Amino acid sequence: MKKLVVVTQQVDPADAVLGATVAKLRALAARVDELVVLTDSATAGALPDNVRIRTFAATHRARRGMRFETALARELSSRPRPSAVLAHMCPIYAVLAAPLARPTGVKVLLWFTHWRRSRLLRTATRVSTTVLSVDERTFPLQTSKLVAIGHGIDVSDLPCVKRPEREPLTLLALGRTSAAKGLVTILRAVEQVPEVRLRIVGPSLTEDERVHRIALERMVIDLALLDRVDITGPVPRHAVPSLYADVDALVNDMREGAADKVVYEAAATCMPVIASNHAFDTLLPERLRFEHGDPDSLAEAIRWLLEADRQALGRTLHGTVVRDHSVETWADRVVELAG
């Protein structure tokens, strides 16, 4: 009997930021006899019948850590014992799990794809059996433990869309209003190409992000882009496929070190994507890439896209995502590495 434990922040298919995790959990559940999910909170009925959920939410961090360790210790002492504990995006889970799991022979896997390095991440890397990421450029530390497994996109939820030839071309920038997303660069590029419109869609979850949103809104006014740029709040996870279908191309200037999942999601829908991050050089042709922080380079790529065969580009990108970055291939690799 194959059993796997996954630790994640939240199980909520409607969450605009963490909703994509649910597809990963479902794919893992389809490949094991029992999946145990340790989480702060979970939406009832979101996962299959062979999934057990243990919540460890608490009002204080120390108590939350104690509740997590108690829940994990019970799973490690039960039979059959899990083959591995997968810590999803939060290094602290790997750090807390390792002293309990590894002495019993249970592997600790850390999934992490972000540019931010920290002392906690270094510790988590040291105590984990294996580190998983999209590829070697989406994990900020050098380690021989790193295994590239793709991004894990639920392509079944993102059907290929044949988009009409619309004018003006509508670009989408999707995600949190973080300065790391390069939205200022995108606005300055759009200013240079009057044939396009831009939709910026996403939440502002921190004070810095709320301040940045205000700055972006002011910038739209200063650049006289009110008739071509819309900035709106997040859409629920179930509405994302419709959002992709309503636009013509995604533009992304996320800083190096994190392969933004929205790039792969948009590509899965047969939509052209223009992005700067070098992690996308195995997905995107050179003409769909630009220099990070360079609005002139981005404007040139947008102008090229205006004249390109966007349907053909989209079909090619879709095929690459299905082959290398689907949630099915991601789950296959996790289960294989869990042993």
PLM regions and their residue ranges:
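Nucleotide-activated donor-binding/catalytic signature segment of Leloir-type glycosyltransferases, i.e.
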Residues: 213-234
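A conserved mid-protein helix/loop that constitutes part of the nucleotide-sugar donor-binding site
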Residues: 19-26, 178-192, 196, 211-212
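Acidic donor-binding loop of glycosyltransferase active sites
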Residues: 245-258, 271
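Glycosyltransferase donor-sugar binding loop
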Residues: 40-42, 197-215
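Donor nucleotide-sugar binding/catalytic pocket of nucleotide-sugar-dependent glycosyltransferases
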Residues: 54-57, 115-118, 125-160
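Short alpha-helical donor nucleotide-sugar binding micro-motif in glycosyltransferases
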Residues: 234-235, 242-247
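Conserved acidic donor-binding segment of nucleotide-sugar-dependent glycosyltransferases
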Residues: 287-296, 302-309
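A charged, aromatic-enriched C-terminal amphipathic alpha-helix characteristic of glycosyltransferases
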Residues: 307-338
